[in-house]
Regions:
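Ferredoxin-type iron-sulfur electron-transfer modules and their immediate structural context
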Residues: 1-161, 165-167, 171-174, 195-226, ...
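Catalytic alpha/large subunits of respiratory electron-transfer oxidoreductases
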Residues: 38, 61-63, 118, 123, ...
Length: 356
């Protein structure tokens, strides 16, 4: 049976992906992968009803049980074993690798005792991100994943984009923050940090707090990728210091008020500043819908056409773009840059503004 990644598509080709022969081949491959990972729970028929405090009839140690793994409810490896129906009577023996946990780097921990050496993290780092921060190494004749000289991720040049976490099918790579939290809802959102506007899926726990960020795989903007700010820099939404009630300054002191009182005060102040001598300036990170409402409010309520947004874009550049392209912004997808022979970057810090 030829592998799909090595056989070119031909006219009239009939592709069967669910035949008994294909499934049996998949099971044989998975048997080898299972031997690289704690498998007492993976091949047990009670896995769906077994709790963390239940007595294991297979005598699986606490550290090797699926219910104590931080990736238990989002483990692609476990889902694949279920899909293939691999309830093995005598799975291949798993030998604990005795690899110390890597917890010294920011943002995420690495437990290579759970690694199945599938190579996904290495490939996404090299082929998609172009970083080469991690690769295959050897230890006592065993192939492992790690940095070139055993250095930390910071020393290896890692960008901490989190792409390796998103493709890891097991619990070898896991976020430090909210490691054990389970998602109860997923909310679609746009990253607010830069003009690229990456599509993100926000995992929310039962208390309504953001616990994890997963880039949207099917987004035409970022294609399942994010930068360190989009992946790990949205925790501010959970801050207890966020202002949740209106504040009105009285005697030079900000005091809490009701929404009705605050809106009435704003309306009374705005009536004093109407017409062409007034202007409305909106935040550049507002959504299209918010900006539309802002301009509508300016024209109808404030009776002015003086509308702008505060931005760090140099006017000379935007004027030139508008004259040349008819639009003061990019008119083509970001991914067209892959086809460019020459890229001119002017007065921009790509790490800050277009890191993805």
């Amino acid at each position: 049976l030829p592998a799909s990644c090595t056989l070119p598509v031909q006219d009239g080709m009939i592709v069967r992906t669910e035949s008994p022969e294909v499934q049996e081949l998949r099971r044989s491959v998975m048997e080898m992968l299972i031997a690289e990972h704690p498998n007492g729970c993976l091949t047990c028929h009670r896995i769906d009803i077994c709790g963390p405090s239940d007595i294991c009839l297979r005598h699986v140690s606490v550290n090797d049980r699926c219910v104590t793994c931080p990736k238990n409810e989002r483990c692609e490896f476990k889902d694949t074993v279920r899909y293939l129906g691999m309830e093995l009577e005598s799975p291949l023996a798993y030998e604990y690798k005795q690899i110390p946990l890597e917890i010294g780097d920011p943002f995420y921990d690495r437990d290579y005792n759970l690694c199945i050496t599938c190579g996904r993290c290495v490939r996404v780092c090299e082929e998609v991100r172009g970083d080469d921060a991690i690769g295959f190494t050897q230890r006592s004749g065993r192939a492992l994943v790690g940095t070139s000289f055993g250095d930390s991720l910071l020393e290896s040049g890692c960008e901490f984009c989190g792409a390796c976490l998103d493709v890891c099918p097991v619990g070898a790579l896991v976020e430090k923050e909210n490691k054990w939290e389970k998602a109860r809802k997923i909310v679609s959102a746009i990253c607010p940090h830069c003009p690229v506007g990456c599509s993100l899926n926000l995992e929310v726990n039962e208390k309504g707090s953001l616990i994890r960020v997963i880039p949207e795989l099917n987004s035409s903007v970022n294609r399942g990728q994010a930068c360190f700010k989009g992946k790990f820099g949205l925790g501010f939404v959970n801050s207890n210091a966020r202002v949740t009630t209106p504040l009105i300054r009285r005697d030079n002191i900000l005091q809490e008020s009701t929404w009705d009182e605050a809106l009435d005060l704003i309306a009374s102040k705005l009536t004093e500043h109407k017409g062409s001598r007034s202007a409305l300036i909106a935040a550049p990170d507002s959504t299209n819908e918010e900006l539309y409402l802002a301009q509508k409010f300016a024209r109808l309520a404030m009776e002015t056409n003086n509308i702008d947004q505060s931005t760090n874009v140099i006017p000379e550049l935007t004027i030139g773009l508008e004259r040349a392209l008819g639009y003061a912004a990019a008119t083509n997808p970001v991914w067209d840059l892959e086809k460019s022979d020459c890229i001119l970057v002017f007065n921009s810090n790509l790490t800050e503004q277009h890191n993805v």
